[in-house]
Every structure is written in structure tokens, then in C-alpha cells.
Swiss-Prot record:
Belongs to the ribonucleoside diphosphate reductase large chain family. This is Ribonucleoside-diphosphate reductase large subunit-like protein. It comes from Human herpesvirus 6A (strain Uganda-1102) (HHV-6 variant A). SUPFAM superfamilies: PFL-like glycyl radical enzymes (SSF51998). One of its GO terms (cellular component) is host cell cytoplasm. The gene is RIR1. One of its GO terms (biological process) is deoxyribonucleotide biosynthetic process. Does not possess a ribonucleotide reductase activity. Betaherpesviruses probably use another strategy to expand the dNTP pool in a quiescent host cell.
Length: 804
């Protein structure tokens, strides 16, 4: 039956055209009439009807106009966002193109072995996709903002047809299943027939139990493209490169990595005079990529604090605009921390050749060499107090990280590697001259909460009780095992297809299981962040992930895979496990499991060299409807499309003045937390006026249960610094890479006192994000409407960001 043609009724709504409808382009659609919160509730159905009248063939980005308007009433954002998401993705679920039909119609785009797999199992694939789509549409379909970010980051066109989310997941599942079935050691460990394997992968991806990086979802299974990659992070150690060498590397690796949306990390300290020019080149390339593509990229610059150029970089950091996607990361040696608290101490800064020699030293000889050069060579000096004050000022800006070099060396599984880089996006990995990367995957721990357990399971090993819920460790171990196999399948795929970043992963085959949803688990079961059970749960999660990763990696070698190239140089070859670096480590898993694992590692080796990370994957976690690993809120939504209309709200309902520009400027997007919104829906206006501070609320307005819940949210997540450190410390023995350390503090907390605590506790990456209470609320009056997109907002705005 022929589908009825749908057209836009431009006069719908208030029976008049708004400003944007006078433009020739039909890709714009305005809902600014519904900007006021009081009208929004009454008009939600009208909005749905208007969206229903959109021609499904139109550019779906027009729905962003609607979101810009409805975000003015942030207390109903989750509901409206999901409603718009349904319409936004309406054509994605068996509407215009069945995913398998679209895949099979593109033999010039999809790899032949993937096409053959889809052909062979086509009927079964259709039944699985139909079954999983029901659950996806009812529970896991993302809102319009998350969905738009998902699709714009991937932005594949299959012979002129935009790839839908189900089509992306089908391509991923088919490719991964085909790889596992073809590679012997993976097939033997997985021990599932292709039907079970495909179905399990489909349910995991559709329900966001775990998530692959956007670059992997973009390129996996497609016919080889020039300069494409499945890895989302790349570290470049350019210390030995000349300016000419850098130009070559930039053309062959750096710029292509940016075009793939990868997070780039570089040590630019030692260029000195050329550094500023190189930095400007990289910033201009970031602007080009973000202007001409839909990719979101990030640059991390490493700065060695013993180099004389460090002061220049800190000054440059302060001058960067707040909207810049650049993070600085200071590499700090042990001798710096030894002088940290000494009164009147001075710090020496060396010029290029001397600083380069120091950088080549391992941490054992670094201090000796530093003192020798301090006595015998010309150098600059700065008082420690002035230097630290400058560092803390940058840290308060929220885009500065620290790496404690001594802790990296002390706790690394690969000893005596002279050059290290790491940071907030990629974790601490050994880097030789050149490139290094990692296969990261996001694990959403919310999925392991259950309401009941089997009598056959053992408490404390297979599950733990959390208030009225159970956290299922047996299921977590099963899922993590499959994730390690999938990660190895992707790495093998990259090597096989000559991924242009594969040279950075071949030696260590590093993978990172990144935890997210932890805070959502705490809030769901009613645990406060400072509760001992919360810290214990996090430690157990890290322990089970690390054990399962190493166990699976060893099993790969037992089934015929070769140990990674770095195995013989690692401490694994000596029979060590990562937590052996720490004293008095509490392990929940039985000792016999660890003993057997050690023996097997010595006998067979490990396929991978790094496994677990506390770092959340910033871009990917936004689609999973959960919290970051330690940060309780959804991240700032980024709207960058050039055809977005910025609505300037003014007093009065009928004023729908709109301003267009080629680039989106000065658009404030609020951050909201679903759990807080749902539990305190009727109290939002009141809570906003008291700044969400528990001690300031009128207890007569709340029930006892609501007061208990409010205590869990802890003054709008303003946790005590000691609680944060104790939480982070609990997982350290099982995190062999970096950890996402988010510190939200008030003015009474000194960052100067925080750094020694982190250093002595054994943190390798000291900072990930620092949010200062006064900085976050400096320009916001919580008792008045917030200046977000217009003048109206009465939602939970914990943090806002000015976005280009």
C-alpha cells in the first residue's frame, strides 16, 4: 500500500508563520512559540503533531530548533527530549529502509565478508532486530540530543542513504561475529554458535550495556578507506621530531586522526620556539574539522614542568577561550613534589638540550641528574609558591590535568620505559618515540543491578546486597569477558586491514574497560557517595573487571594466540599482577583464583598489556542514559550544526524573534540529572532557590523518605574532598591505567593541599576535571530565571558551559 505523502503545514500552531519560515530552505522548522514553561505543558501534544507532519525525507536536524526552545523549561527536558527522540529516529526503525536491505544494497561500501554473513543469516538477523527493537524503543531509545550527537559523530552515507542507528548496530554485530568466527582463538573461547553470538551482541549494543568508541562504530565493516581508524585516542610523543618531521607526521597521522574524531595527545614542550606555531596549526585544524565535519575532537598538550617553556604554556592556557577543546596536562617528577611543601624552595627550569636529557631519565635517576644540572648548568628559576599558585589557577579552570611521573614508574607493569604520556582522555601508557593508542570500551554498570538472585549463586563472589537491590558480579564477569574478546577482535581487524593507527597498538594491544554509570547505581539504591558500602562496591567492581580481563587475555594465549610483544618486558613475565604494587590489598575473589591466574600468566603469557581504566569516554557515554563514572550528571549537550537557529527570548509569549548565524555562538545548554528530576519534580523551584543545599531546606516541606533521598544527592553533589579521595583510592590497586578524578569543591578547599594527598596515595593521573562551586555559579542567580537560551528556565542546572 502506498504511503500517504506528508507535507509540512507551515501555518500550523498559532496559524501564522514565524521568522524562519520566510526563508527558502524547508529544512528549518521553528517551535519558538512554545518557549514558556507554562505553555509547554499544554502544547507538548501540539509539538508532537507538528513533528508528525514533517516529511520523513526532510533533514531531521530541523528538530534541533525544537529542542533549543523546549530546553527553556529544564524540569521537563527528559520527557520532551525522549519524545522528540522518538520522532527524530522514527525513520530509523524499519520505516523507510530495513537495515539488512540497506546493507545488502551497498556492495561497494560494505566489506564482502560482512555482506556474505548478512546474506547467509538474513532471516535470523531480521527476527533478532525486530525483537531487540521493541526493547530499544520502549526503554533505551535515546533522546533527540543524544541521538543527534550519535548520528552526527558517525555520519555515514550508504549510497546516498544516511545510516540509521539500527543499521549501524547491524553492521557492527555482523562484522564482529564474522571476525570472531574466522579467528581461531576467539572462536574457541567464545564457544557460541553464530546465532547466539549475533543475538547477544545485538542486545548488548541496543541496550547500551557496553559501548564501542564512535570511530569504531563509524569505520568497522566498511570497505577500506584511506586514513580511517577504529581507535578513538592517539598519543604522539614528538620529542625527537624536527619541525620538518612534525609536518610529515601531521600530514600522515595527526590531521587524519582529527578527521576521524580521535582525541589527540601530544608532548609539545620540547619544541620551545616552534611550539607556539605548531600549536596554532593544530588549533586551526581542529576548527576546520569541527566546521566542515560533524566530528567532535579534543587536543591534549603535555607540558614537562622542568622545561623552561612550561611557563609559556601556562600563560597560553590562561589566554585560551573557555570554549576551546584543549586540555593541558603537566608531567610532574618526584623531586617537584619533594619540594612542594618546603618554604622558600625554588624550582629550576632548563633549556632544550638539558631538559631533553632529563626527560630520557627514568624516575630513579631523574632526581640525581636534576640536582647535578642545577649545580653545573645555566637555568631559570622560579619560587615553588609562585609556580604552584600558577598551576592551581589553571586547575580551577577545569581543563588542566596532572601526571605524577614517579607514580607512573612505580606502578607501571612495564619497568624502565623512559618516556611516558597519559592524561584525562587516554590513560597512562608507555610511549616510545612515535605513536601509541588503546582500544577503549565503555561498560555501563547500571545493567548489573537486579531484584532477585538464584540460590545457586554465592554472596560476595557472585553478587552483593545493596539495600533492596542486588549487584550481579557473575553477570559482570561474563559481559567483561565478551568485551575483552570483542576488543581483541577489533585490534586484529585493524592490523589485518592496515588501520593507519595500528602501529600504535601492535606492541601492547592495550585495551581499556572504562566504567560508567557508577553514580547512577549509588543513587538508585540510595547509597550516599561517602557511604562505606559505596566505596566497597566500587573496589569490587574494579577487582572483578581486572581479574576477568587478565583471565580472558591469558585464555587467548592458551587457545593459540601469541602473547603481545611487550609481554617479555613486563612484570607479568615475572609472575606479578598489578595489585602487587600496593600493600594490604583487600581481595574479594578467592585466593585460589588469583594463584591459578599467576601460574597461567607465567606459563602462557598475556595477549594484552593494559586492561582497566576509571576514565569515562566523554563522547560515547552521552548516549547511554546514565552517569559518568564519578560525575552524577549528563554532560553538556553540544549543538554545532550551522543550520541551527538561535532563539533570543524576550518578555512576552508572542515574541518569537530569531537570530541566524553561520556558526552557533553563545548558546548555553543545561546539564540535568534524571534521577534528581524525577524524585523531586514538585520541589524543583524551591530547591533551586536554596541551591540544593540539604541544611538549608525547610524539612516540613519534605517527607522522611524525600529527606533521605536528598541527603544522597548531597547539596547538589557538592561532596567533601576526603570522600572523593577515599572513593578514588579504593579502586586504585585494580586500575592499571588512569582514573577519572572529578573534584567538585567550594571556595574553602585549597587545591594546594589536594595535590600532595593524591601523590602520596599513589595516583598516576591526578586530575581529570576540577569544578569550583564559585566558578560554576559565578554568573548565575539561582533565585531568578537562568540565562540559558532565552530568559526562561526553572530546571536543575548544576553546570553550564558556553559552547561555540
Amino acid at each position: 500500500m502506498k504511503r500517504k505523502e506528508r507535507r509540512i503545514n507551515k501555518d500550523y500552531g498559532y496559524n501564522r508563520k514565524c521568522v524562519c519560515h520566510y526563508e527558502a530552505s524547508q529544512k528549518r522548522f521553528c517551535y519558538s512559540q512554545y518557549s514558556c514553561a507554562s505553555v509547554l505543558y499544554e502544547r507538548v501534544r501540539d509539538i508532537a503533531k507538528i513533528i508528525d507532519r514533517l516529511d520523513s525525507g526532510l533533514d531531521a536536524w530541523c528538530l534541533r530548533d525544537a529542542i533549543i526552545s523546549v530546553l527553556r523549561a529544564t524540569h521537563c527536558v527528559p520527557r520532551v527530549d525522549r519524545m522528540l527522540g522518538r520522532w527524530y529516529l522514527k525513520t530509523s526503525v524499519f520505516y523507510d529502509f530495513c537495515p539488512d536491505d540497506l546493507i545488502l544494497s551497498c556492495p561497494n561500501v560494505i566489506m564482502p565478508n560482512v555482506l556474505n554473513f548478512v546474506k547467509k543469516y538474513r532471516d535470523f538477523i531480521r527476527s533478532v532486530l525486530y525483537k531487540v527493537s521493541v526493547s530499544w524503543k520502549n526503554q533505551y531509545m535515546p533522546g533527540v540530543l543524544a541521538a543527534s550527537r550519535f548520528l552526527e559523530e558517525i555520519s555515514n552515507s550508504l549510497n546516498g542513504v544516511e545510516e540509521s542507528i539500527p543499521c549501524i548496530y547491524l553492521r557492527m554485530c555482523a562484522t564482529l561475529t564474522e571476525i570472531v568466527l574466522r579467528i581461531g582463538y576467539l572462536r574457541e573461547i567464545y564457544q557460541e554458535n553464530p546465532y547466539v553470538m549475533f543475538e547477544e551482541l545485538a542486545f548488548s549494543l541496543f541496550t547500551q550495556k557496553w559501548v564501542l568508541p564512535f570511530s569504531c562504530m563509524t569505520n568497522l565493516g566498511l570497505v577500506e578507506k584511506a586514513n580511517s581508524t577504529v581507535f578513538d585516542v592517539a598519543i604522539y610523543n614528538t620529542c625527537l621530531y624536527s619541525l620538518v618531521d612534525f609536518t610529515i607526521v601531521n600530514g600522515e597521522h595527526l590531521f587524519p586522526a582529527l578527521l576521524n574524531g580521535s582525541n589527540i595527545s601530544m608532548n609539545l614542550t620540547r619544541y620551545q620556539q616552534e611550539a607556539k606555531n605548531i600549536f596554532e596549526i593544530l588549533l586551526s585544524q581542529i576548527r576546520v574539522v569541527e566546521r566542515d565535519t560533524d566530528k567532535t575532537v579534543q587536543l591534549t598538550v603535555y607540558v614537562e614542568v622542568w622545561h623552561v617553556s612550561a611557563l609559556m604554556w601556562l600563560d597560553l592556557y590562561e589566554a585560551l577561550p573557555q570554549t576551546s577543546r584543549v586540555t593541558f596536562c603537566l608531567i610532574i617528577p618526584g623531586i617537584f613534589m619533594d619540594r612542594y611543601e618546603l618554604k622558600r624552595a625554588q624550582w629550576s627550569l632548563f633549556h632544550k638540550n638539558i631538559a631533553f636529557e632529563l626527560g630520557k631519565c627514568d624516575e630513579i635517576t631523574f632526581s640525581t641528574k636534576y640536582l647535578e644540572f642545577e649545580r653545573t648548568t645555566d637555568h631559570a628559576k622560579i619560587t615553588m609558591s609562585s609556580f604552584i599558585e600558577k598551576i592551581c589557577l589553571c586547575l580551577k579552570g577545569g581543563r588542566m590535568g596532572l601526571i605524577f611521573r614517579k607514580n607512573v614508574y612505580q606502578y607501571s607493569m612495564i619497568p624502565h620505559v623512559p618516556l611516558y604520556c597519559g592524561g584525562d582522555f587516554l590513560d597512562v601508557l608507555p610511549v616510545r618515540d612515535g605513536i601509541n593508542t588503546c582500544m577503549r570500551m565503555l561498560l555501563n554498570v547500571v545493567h548489573f543491578l537486579g531484584d532477585e538472585v538464584s540460590d545457586e549463586l554465592t554472596e560476595e563472589i557472585d553478587f552483593v546486597r545493596l539495600q533492596c537491590k542486588f549487584f550481579m558480579f557473575n553477570e559482570l564477569r561474563r559481559v567483561v569477558r565478551k568485551m575483552v574478546l570483542v576488543a581483541n577482535a577489533v585490534i586484529d581487524y585493524a592490523v589485518e586491514n592496515k588501520d593507519f593507527l595500528c602501529e600504535g597498538i601492535e606492541d601492547g594491544r592495550s585495551l581499556g574497560i572504562c566504567v560508567t554509570g557508577l553514580h547512577s547505581v549509588f543513587m538508585t539504591v540510595g547509597l550516599s557517595y561517602a557511604h562505606p558500602d559505596a566505596r566497597r562496591l566500587y573496589r569490587m567492581i574494579c577487582e572483578h573487571i581486572y581479574y576477568t580481563c587478565v583471565r580472558t587475555s591469558v585464555d587467548c594465549c592458551m587457545k593459540g594466540a601469541e602473547p603481545c610483544n611487550l609481554f617479555d618486558r613486563s612484570k607479568y613475565a615475572l609472575g606479578m599482577l598489578y595489585f602487587d604494587h600496593f600493600d594490604n590489598v583487600e581481595c574479594t575473589l578467592p585466593e585460589e583464583l588469583w594463584t591459578t591466574l599467576r601460574k597461567d600468566v607465567l606459563m602462557h603469557g598475556v595477549r594484552n598489556i593494559h586492561f582497566t581504566a576509571g576514565t569515562a569516554m566523554q563522547k560515547e557515554f552521552d548516549i547511554i542514559n546514565s552517569s559518568e563514572s564519578f560525575w552524577p550528571m549528563e554532560d553538556n549537550k553540544i549543538l554545532r550544526r550551522s543550520n541551527i537557529k538561535v532563539v533570543i527570548g524576550k518578555d512576552g509569549l508572542n515574541d518569537v524573534t530569531s537570530v541566524y548565524s553561520s556558526e552557533l555562538k553563545s548558546l548555553y545548554i543545561p546539564v540535568y540529572n534524571n534521577l534528581l528530576l524525577n524524585r523531586f519534580n514538585k520541589h524543583q523551584q524551591y530547591l533551586k532557590t536554596v541551591g540544593y543545599r540539604v541544611l538549608n531546606v525547610d524539612t516540613n516541606l519534605f517527607t522522611d523518605k524525600e529527606l533521605d533521598d536528598l541527603a544522597v544527592f548531597k547539596d547538589g553533589f557538592s561532596y567533601h574532598l576526603n570522600d572523593l579521595i577515599e572513593m578514588y583510592k579504593s579502586g586504585l590497586p585494580f586500575l592499571d591505567q588512569g582514573q577519572a578524578n572529578v573534584f567538585y569543591f567550594n571556595d574553602t578547599v585549597s587545591l594546594r593541599l589536594l595535590l600532595p594527598l593524591l601523590y602520596k596515595a599513589g595516583f598516576k593521573v591526578a586530575m581529570y576535571k576540577v569544578l569550583c562551586n564559585s566558578e560554576m555559579y559565578k554568573h548565575l542567580d539561582l533565585s531568578n530565571p537562568l540565562p540559558l537560551i532565552g530568559k526562561c528556565s526553572d530546571g536543575v542546572v548544576m553546570h553550564v558551559k558556553n559552547i561555540l
